[in-house]
Amino acid sequence: MKPKIIIWGHPLGTHTHSYSNQGYYKAFKKLGYETHWFPDQEPDKDFDFSNCIFIGEGDSGAKHIPINDTSTYFMMYLPDPRKFDGAKRLIDVRLTAKNCKDHIYDFSFDASKCKKMGPSVWFEPKQEGLIHFKNNYVDAQIPDRDKMYISWATDLLPDEIDFDEMYREREDAIWFCGTISQSGQAENWSNWKPFIEQCSENGIDFHYNDVWQNPLSFEEVMELTRRSILGIDIRAKWHVETRVVTCRVAKNISYGHLGLTNSEQIYQEMDGNCVYNPDPAQLFHDGMANRKNYEMIRQGMQYVKENHTYINRANSLLKVYEEGL
């Protein structure tokens, strides 16, 4: 019997992880699984949470998640994994990052220690015995846990990717719907600034919509992105150094754009099916010079369709789940 899929916490538009939640929700429903998405509040006492696969985020989105010994939990960000001691199985979900250290994590993804489960998804089985686990909240000897390393994906399903969108007439403007930060670990203003300056000098209006101040619907973000003359993704210094692969390039490509990135790791993850330049100012000019390279755009869209949707991620997650049966 198929397990039920439970997406837990972060309703759409309320948190970065709400977008991966939405991707999994759509994908598992498409794959024919009974799929539910619950807010992080007291569980519905009339719902049977046994024999489920839970998918969630443990730092701020799992305060009320029901834990039982018949269900498997795929959780990203775990301040204290001992919270899930009563679960049948816990999988620590991580991004494929190098030298990643923050208030929760201190790890470096090493593919040689892992089993590849699908495009951009890797499984590292737990070690036997206790390990030393330390972060800003815990310093203890605890049992190890299985780990799944992933890259995020586009929010479109394969059959929603419309190749005709590459021919759409664009406006002399760019709408960026995301986060531009001038401080903190994810500071990216210093990389955005030279790109925005090139927009201004070349008659391209740059519009920034802060997703936290003015959250937009998925449809609104996709439409604004498609209207933009370029589909751009500029990573913060920390993202470039840790080689994190986020979802924006995959989304932009799937919406019909030439992929543009200042991250070498994202370029490699796309198997070269996008434009890479570490210099954001030059990336603007590279994008403008190639924005109607329809063969390259088509190849990128096909690559994302085959490798970087949540159908891929859901199928890989199921393979990790089956490793524990």
Residue ranges and their predicted role:
Residues 6-7, 230-232, 283, 296, ...:
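Generic signal for short, ordered secondary-structure residues
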Residues 236, 284-288:
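Regular secondary-structure segments
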Residues 2-273, 305, 310-311, 315, ...:
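Nucleotide-sugar donor-binding catalytic core of glycosyltransferases
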Residues 246-249, 281, 297:
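Short amphipathic alpha-helical surface patches that serve as generic macromolecular interface elements
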Residues 287-323:
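A charged, aromatic-enriched C-terminal amphipathic alpha-helix characteristic of glycosyltransferases
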Residues 216, 278-279, 291, 308:
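Short coil/turn linker and secondary-structure boundary residues
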Residues 259-263, 274-278, 290-294:
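Short amphipathic alpha-helical segments, especially helix-boundary/capping motifs
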